[in-house]
Amino acid sequence: MWLQPIVVLAAIIIGARLGGIGLGVMGGLGLALLCFVFGLQPTAPPIDVMLMIVAVISAASCMQAAGGLDYMVKLAERMLRKHPSRVTLLSPLVTYLFTFVAGTGHIAYSVLPVIAEVARETKIRPERPLGIAVIASQQAITASPISAATVALLGMLAGFDISLFDILKISVPATLIGVLVGAFCSMKVGKELEDDPEYQRRLKEGVIENRLVETASSFDVRKARISVGIFLLATFLIVLFGSVDALRPVFQSDGKNVPLDMPSIIEIVMLSTSALILLVCRIDGIKAVQGSIFSA
């Protein structure tokens, strides 16, 4: 029935416009219409996917509270300012790496103002690096070993003797090549700023100001490095568990040896990562939930 996809699309669009928890609650309203009005039977809620997202976001939020995200942004800023003429090529690689490591695209938001500033300083149209940088951060979700998308695919292919490493050796090169091709194409988007009359007019009238974007510098470098190190170690362990089945704990179920599933491993490892960051770096847990990653 053609009304059903309209209900789904309307719930997504309205939820996205509401922002915050709007997408989630509008999804519930859309489900209510499909269930009670159209008589469709709802499936089981994706509990594992939701728990994985919560676990990964919790770990990333704790890393941000420890200054790890600011430390990563500082490193990215240093690299971009060292090679400003290559910002269109380097910025998507930076956001790709951020998302690949964290498993969520929200972590890449912090570096976008730096990318825009470096582009303006170099007289490069900001939409060139910014556009492909945002795309790259989303492409990395399908290649990240700890993203819900990758683990969901791993679960679907569980009966075909396909490991996490088998997925990554296809998804990582494919997405990286696509991002690089897109970056090269983005280098020719629009006129050069010095040849753009509208940009020159706005610059002359003071509508556009080349203000300096200051990244956070008040964080404890030692704690920041430790938090990033713990997070990277957790990501490595997840790849290891997903690639080598023999490393997973095995339990008896109906007389058969059943290894611990990857969603549970990701949830356990990432929640443990959150705890370790809080304990080792001595971070206030309330500070973690007040950060931009958790609220996003």
List the predicted regions and their residue ranges.
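Transmembrane helical cores of multi-pass ion-transport proteins
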Residues: 14, 23, 87-98, 126, ...
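Membrane-embedded alpha-helical segments and adjacent helix-loop junctions characteristic
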Residues: 14-16, 26-32, 40-124, 128-129, ...
